[in-house]
């Protein structure tokens, strides 16, 4: 990633959509139509994946953390709880052109 005279968060200024995925004992997903989005784990540590099922060995986001993600095309976000506590993966889509 390169940063040129801009703040890292400059491209994530204008939220345009909100999604959520229940992260429980089985994989759940939501289609995200934006290519710039954030994910936030609420209530539990969560395993997530983009475009394929979340498993015990896919990407990890700790409880109450927020990650900003940019992908080349719209995708599905898949979620699964990391341990025995259910949680929710909150997703905010951003307009990349504003």
Language-model features, listed with the residues they occupy:
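Noncatalytic modules at the cell exterior or secretory-pathway interfaces
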Residues: 35-37, 71-86
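Surface-exposed ligand/attachment interfaces on beta-rich extracellular proteins
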Residues: 15-34, 56
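Short, intrinsically disordered N-terminal pre-domain segments
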Residues: 1-18, 93-98
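Residue-level recognition of conserved beta-strand positions in structured domain cores
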Residues: 41, 50, 81, 91-93
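Solvent-exposed strand-loop boundary residues in beta-sheet-rich modules
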Residues: 52-54, 83, 97
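Beta-sandwich interaction modules
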Residues: 62-74
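Edge beta-strands of jelly-roll/beta-sandwich modules across compartments, strongly enriched
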Residues: 46, 85-95
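Short, surface-exposed beta-strand/strand-loop-strand elements in extracellular ectodomains
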Residues: 40-57
């Amino acid at each position: 990633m390169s940063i040129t005279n801009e703040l890292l968060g400059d491209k994530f200024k204008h939220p345009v959509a909100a999604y959520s995925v229940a992260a429980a004992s089985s994989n759940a997903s939501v289609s995200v139509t934006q290519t710039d989005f954030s994910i936030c784990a609420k209530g539990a540590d969560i395993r997530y994946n983009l475009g394929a099922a979340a498993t015990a060995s896919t990407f990890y986001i700790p409880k109450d953390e927020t990650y900003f993600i940019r992908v080349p095309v719209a995708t599905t976000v898949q979620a699964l709880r990391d341990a025995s506590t259910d949680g929710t993966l909150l997703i905010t889509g951003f307009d990349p052109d504003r």
